[in-house]
Amino acid sequence: MAGYKILQAQEKGIYVLKFVGEIRLNLCSTLDNLVESITQDPSFRTVVIDLSETEVIDSTTLGLLAKIALAAKKQSGCTPSLISTHPDITRIIGSMGFDSIFIIVSEPVSSMERLEEIPELKASEQQVRDKVLEAHKILMGMNGRNREEFKNLVHALECEETG
Protein backbone atom coordinates (compact mmCIF):
# COMPACT_ATOMS: atom_id res chain seq x y z
CA MET A 1 0.00 0.00 0.00
CA ALA A 2 1.19 3.52 -0.82
CA GLY A 3 2.13 5.90 1.98
CA TYR A 4 -0.53 8.35 0.84
CA LYS A 5 -3.95 8.59 -0.74
CA ILE A 6 -6.80 10.99 -1.33
CA LEU A 7 -10.36 9.81 -0.75
CA GLN A 8 -13.48 11.59 -1.99
CA ALA A 9 -17.25 11.52 -1.59
CA GLN A 10 -19.90 13.93 -2.83
CA GLU A 11 -23.55 14.46 -2.06
CA LYS A 12 -25.73 17.34 -3.26
CA GLY A 13 -22.77 19.59 -4.05
CA ILE A 14 -20.98 18.99 -0.75
CA TYR A 15 -17.62 17.32 -1.28
CA VAL A 16 -15.63 15.47 1.36
CA LEU A 17 -11.91 15.01 0.75
CA LYS A 18 -9.86 12.89 3.13
CA PHE A 19 -6.08 12.94 2.97
CA VAL A 20 -4.26 9.90 4.35
CA GLY A 21 -0.52 9.66 4.98
CA GLU A 22 2.15 11.99 3.61
CA ILE A 23 0.53 14.49 1.25
CA ARG A 24 3.31 16.22 -0.64
CA LEU A 25 4.38 17.63 -3.96
CA ASN A 26 4.02 14.22 -5.64
CA LEU A 27 0.23 14.55 -5.46
CA CYS A 28 -0.03 18.17 -6.67
CA SER A 29 -1.25 17.29 -10.18
CA THR A 30 -3.75 14.79 -8.81
CA LEU A 31 -5.03 17.31 -6.29
CA ASP A 32 -5.12 20.20 -8.76
CA ASN A 33 -7.07 18.08 -11.24
CA LEU A 34 -9.50 17.18 -8.46
CA VAL A 35 -9.85 20.84 -7.39
CA GLU A 36 -10.53 21.88 -11.00
CA SER A 37 -13.20 19.20 -11.50
CA ILE A 38 -14.90 20.07 -8.20
CA THR A 39 -14.93 23.82 -8.78
CA GLN A 40 -16.32 23.34 -12.31
CA ASP A 41 -19.21 21.22 -11.01
CA PRO A 42 -22.31 23.48 -11.22
CA SER A 43 -23.75 21.82 -8.10
CA PHE A 44 -20.58 22.51 -6.03
CA ARG A 45 -21.50 24.29 -2.79
CA THR A 46 -18.76 23.56 -0.29
CA VAL A 47 -16.09 21.12 0.79
CA VAL A 48 -15.04 19.35 3.97
CA ILE A 49 -11.31 18.61 4.12
CA ASP A 50 -10.38 15.83 6.54
CA LEU A 51 -6.74 15.85 7.66
CA SER A 52 -7.29 13.57 10.67
CA GLU A 53 -5.16 10.81 9.09
CA THR A 54 -2.65 13.13 7.43
CA GLU A 55 0.89 12.68 8.72
CA VAL A 56 2.69 15.31 6.63
CA ILE A 57 1.34 18.10 4.42
CA ASP A 58 3.44 20.53 2.39
CA SER A 59 2.87 24.14 1.39
CA THR A 60 1.98 23.25 -2.22
CA THR A 61 -0.87 21.09 -0.98
CA LEU A 62 -1.94 23.84 1.42
CA GLY A 63 -2.05 26.30 -1.48
CA LEU A 64 -4.32 23.98 -3.45
CA LEU A 65 -6.57 23.53 -0.41
CA ALA A 66 -6.77 27.33 -0.13
CA LYS A 67 -7.74 27.44 -3.82
CA ILE A 68 -10.74 25.16 -3.28
CA ALA A 69 -11.77 27.01 -0.10
CA LEU A 70 -11.73 30.35 -1.88
CA ALA A 71 -13.72 28.87 -4.79
CA ALA A 72 -16.36 27.49 -2.40
CA LYS A 73 -16.73 30.84 -0.68
CA LYS A 74 -17.01 32.65 -4.02
CA GLN A 75 -19.42 30.17 -5.61
CA SER A 76 -21.86 29.63 -2.74
CA GLY A 77 -20.91 31.96 0.09
CA CYS A 78 -20.37 28.89 2.32
CA THR A 79 -17.23 28.65 4.43
CA PRO A 80 -15.74 25.17 4.04
CA SER A 81 -14.65 23.02 6.99
CA LEU A 82 -11.23 21.55 7.67
CA ILE A 83 -10.78 18.72 10.17
CA SER A 84 -7.38 18.66 11.84
CA THR A 85 -6.74 16.44 14.85
CA HIS A 86 -2.91 16.56 14.89
CA PRO A 87 -1.39 19.50 16.79
CA ASP A 88 1.51 19.90 14.32
CA ILE A 89 -0.78 20.14 11.31
CA THR A 90 -3.22 22.38 13.19
CA ARG A 91 -0.33 24.71 14.04
CA ILE A 92 0.79 24.85 10.38
CA ILE A 93 -2.68 25.60 9.01
CA GLY A 94 -3.16 28.21 11.72
CA SER A 95 0.13 29.90 10.88
CA MET A 96 -0.89 30.03 7.20
CA GLY A 97 -4.11 31.88 8.04
CA PHE A 98 -6.45 29.02 7.20
CA ASP A 99 -8.78 30.05 10.02
CA SER A 100 -9.81 32.95 7.77
CA ILE A 101 -10.97 30.67 4.92
CA PHE A 102 -12.00 27.47 6.74
CA ILE A 103 -13.98 26.51 9.81
CA ILE A 104 -11.34 24.49 11.69
CA VAL A 105 -12.73 21.41 13.44
CA SER A 106 -10.65 19.36 15.89
CA GLU A 107 -12.89 16.26 16.12
CA PRO A 108 -12.62 13.48 13.51
CA VAL A 109 -15.59 12.46 11.38
CA SER A 110 -16.99 9.13 12.53
CA SER A 111 -18.26 7.63 9.26
CA MET A 112 -16.33 7.67 5.98
CA GLU A 113 -17.43 4.44 4.29
CA ARG A 114 -18.67 6.20 1.13
CA LEU A 115 -15.28 7.65 0.25
CA GLU A 116 -13.59 6.49 -2.96
CA GLU A 117 -9.86 6.63 -3.59
CA ILE A 118 -8.65 9.12 -6.22
CA PRO A 119 -6.03 7.62 -8.57
CA GLU A 120 -2.68 9.41 -8.68
CA LEU A 121 -1.93 11.35 -11.88
CA LYS A 122 1.58 11.47 -13.30
CA ALA A 123 2.90 14.90 -14.21
CA SER A 124 5.90 16.33 -16.01
CA GLU A 125 8.47 18.38 -14.14
CA GLN A 126 7.10 21.54 -15.81
CA GLN A 127 3.52 20.71 -14.78
CA VAL A 128 4.65 20.17 -11.19
CA ARG A 129 6.60 23.45 -11.22
CA ASP A 130 3.51 25.29 -12.55
CA LYS A 131 1.31 23.84 -9.78
CA VAL A 132 3.88 24.67 -7.09
CA LEU A 133 4.05 28.26 -8.36
CA GLU A 134 0.25 28.62 -8.49
CA ALA A 135 -0.24 27.13 -5.03
CA HIS A 136 2.34 29.41 -3.42
CA LYS A 137 0.91 32.50 -5.13
CA ILE A 138 -2.47 31.60 -3.61
CA LEU A 139 -0.88 31.30 -0.16
CA MET A 140 0.93 34.63 -0.64
CA GLY A 141 -2.38 36.29 -1.45
CA MET A 142 -3.89 35.19 1.87
CA ASN A 143 -1.79 37.38 4.20
CA GLY A 144 1.44 39.33 4.64
CA ARG A 145 3.17 36.61 6.63
CA ASN A 146 2.67 34.10 3.81
CA ARG A 147 3.75 36.71 1.25
CA GLU A 148 7.01 37.19 3.12
CA GLU A 149 7.46 33.43 3.72
CA PHE A 150 7.11 32.40 0.07
CA LYS A 151 8.29 35.40 -1.97
CA ASN A 152 11.80 33.97 -2.54
CA LEU A 153 10.45 30.59 -3.66
CA VAL A 154 7.96 32.22 -6.05
CA HIS A 155 10.67 34.51 -7.41
CA ALA A 156 13.02 31.56 -7.98
CA LEU A 157 10.30 29.57 -9.77
CA GLU A 158 9.39 32.55 -11.94
CA CYS A 159 13.06 33.04 -12.83
CA GLU A 160 13.30 29.36 -13.87
CA GLU A 161 10.33 29.87 -16.21
CA THR A 162 11.91 32.83 -17.97
CA GLY A 163 15.48 31.53 -17.76
Where are each of the predicted segments found?
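STAS-like cytosolic regulatory interaction modules
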Residues: 1-53, 71-163
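Residues immediately C-terminal
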Residues: 56
